[in-house]
Amino acid sequence: TPNMSDEQKQRIRMHYKRSFLDYDPRQGMSELIQDGINRNPDMKPIKKNSRISLKDTQIGTLTNQITFVSKAIMRLTKLQALFFANSPFTQDAIATGWADENSEYAKQYMNEDLSWSKMESLTDVELYNCPNMTRLPEFIFDLPDLQLLNIACNRGIKPDDILTDWQKLADDEDTGPKIQILYMGYNNLEAFPPHESLKKMVKLGLLDCIHNNIKTLNPFGTEVKLSDLKLDYNQIEVIPDDFCAFTDQVEGLGFSHNELKYIPNIFNAKSVYVMGSVDFSYNKIGSEGKNINCPMSEFKGINASTITLSNNQIGTFPTELFASDSPISTIDLSNNRMTSIPKNSLKPKDGNYKNTYMLTTIDLRFNKLTSLSDDFRATTLPYLSNMDVSFNCFSKFPTQPLNSSQLQAFGIRHQRDAEGNRILREWPTGITSCPSLIQLQIGSNDIRKVTEKLTPQLWILDIADNPNISIDVTSVCSYIEAGMYVLIYDKTQDIRGCDALDIER
């Protein structure tokens, strides 16, 4: 397209990011929480995953038989974007000769001064999924204004070679200071180039290195400000404190599926800019007995609204995040090793931390919690609206969050002791008086007789898989019949007062 506008060019540049990289980490939270978030007009809705499905081209699969690219391509001096994908050519077969040196066309332009260095309009290059390439082609380093380079899915390039080529790219005076977007996912990269090279990439904004074998991260330094960073699915153990800085346009950062043992100290909770999300799921945080690897006074917190720490080894609630005034509204701590959240986990002995009040959504499923402290009362969390403590070890209903006037959804399904016995037996009397609560999931427990009168305000109720429950739903039967009350139940349960439920007697 001649004379592409900046908007058109940006839309093309971000297509790969939208298709392969973008995801909302809140998709890993419980259905109850996702439903609560999507019902709340004040919260950003959770988008469905838009990643490419398995029906699309897989790594190593070819879609054409291009084995040679004529040097005639260098005559296209106004070319703005050059995309090759799923092709069998090698790096030496790109514009290194004529298709037929004896052709009239080749003879006509044989003596023309053709050079990649003259292609000043060519800013975007993609060499995607070309399995026969063993190095980056030399022409890449001659382009005078390369801004985007997509070299994802080139697994024919060995670890040392792709590292050498990246370092060469950074050191080159033409490419290093100008590249803004670098897609390098699904390769064999094991380490980053040295800091002396990386610091030259001063305009780099987006870096994608997902699904590599990276173990060693060298820092860019804080002069390089990234707006998007994806390092998921690697083997990274440590992120240097001076790894990089971030712009005010960060939507999401991905560090999931690595070997991190501590929450990195590369952010700053005191920044006026709040990032969308930071994902640390599926790491080893907490495995050394602590969540950070520095004194509390030196931990800078995280300036993000959503922080995902699920599927780690956290045994102690990450108070460090709140004590450092991180502006967190949603936190996912599911699938960890916490047995309790003691007093002063969310607040100091006197008063409150500056930004803890912003917390609205907490996922604590799949831990071994037996109790909650008074930190979860409205005096500390006045805007708490969605909370799920299912798959824990509560023998008593934790009533602390129920005094929040904003609480809309609460889950406490499947509470078991170490032997797998059902241990939650008592109905939380008074729960129907919670001013904003519309959904309660208390299924898969051993709730016995319920004497409380149900109200239509709490209109989503899960009591299924409570084999000994006895409950009267007369007060909400008309709403059930009208389809205005969602009761999740078993037909074999002792539920009375509504023939519409077709209970087996």
Predicted regions and their residues:
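Conserved hydrophobic beta-strand positions in leucine-rich repeat
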Residues: 50-54, 60, 82-84, 122-127, ...
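Inter-repeat linker/turn residues at the boundaries of leucine-rich repeats
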Residues: 47, 64, 74-77, 117-120, ...
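The feature encodes a structural signal of leucine-rich repeats
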Residues: 34, 69-71, 92-96, 110-114, ...
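Leucine-rich solenoid repeat scaffolds
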Residues: 451-505
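Eukaryotic tandem repeat interaction scaffolds
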Residues: 289, 344-345, 360-433, 438-441
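Conserved hydrophobic position(s) of the canonical leucine-rich repeat
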Residues: 49, 66, 79, 122, ...
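LRR N-terminal entry segment and analogous cap-like coil->beta motifs
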Residues: 1, 11-68, 72-81, 85-107, ...
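Consensus "Asn ladder" position of solenoid repeat domains
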Residues: 57, 64, 87, 130, ...
